[in-house]
Amino acid sequence: MQRLLGSIVILATVFTFCEATISSACLRCICNVESGCRPIGCHYDVYSYSCGYFQIKENYWEDCGKPGTSFKACANDYTCASNCVRAYMKRYIGSSGCPANCESYARIHNGGPRGCRHPSTLRYWEKVHQQGCNVNS
């Protein structure tokens, strides 16, 4: 019985860790960096278009599960775009090798699935941090 309870505690801990999600505060800081948190449309940026509140690229939208009616429509709708970012983070934080915190989420948003491990995303994190977020936001 004690062994069974120990297994349940371990499974609950693993489940909780895997279910970590990006906070609304962290989302807002990323949104502020990307667009001033406005639906600014699409701009050509690094070989493809980046659109909307979070300047989402089409492959990012595909990775988050293609919510909404289209890539551009979702990116320019705050609720849809936020849900896309949440789904993207949920998909990749566990395999990134980084802790589930605002810094990791921001760096993954900027640098892709393992962006939290790339030194090139530290500058982006500083911009997010300047919006009032910290690692634990």
Curated annotation (Swiss-Prot):
Substrate binds at residues 57-63, 88, 109-111. InterPro entries: Invert_lysozyme, Lysozyme-like_dom_sf. GO terms for cellular component: extracellular region. Residues 21-135 form the I-type lysozyme domain. Keywords: Antibiotic, Antimicrobial, Bacteriolytic enzyme, Disulfide bond, Glycosidase, Hydrolase, Secreted, Signal. It is found in: Secreted. Residues 1-20 form the signal peptide. The keyword Disulfide bond applies. This is Lysozyme. It comes from Magallana gigas (Pacific oyster).
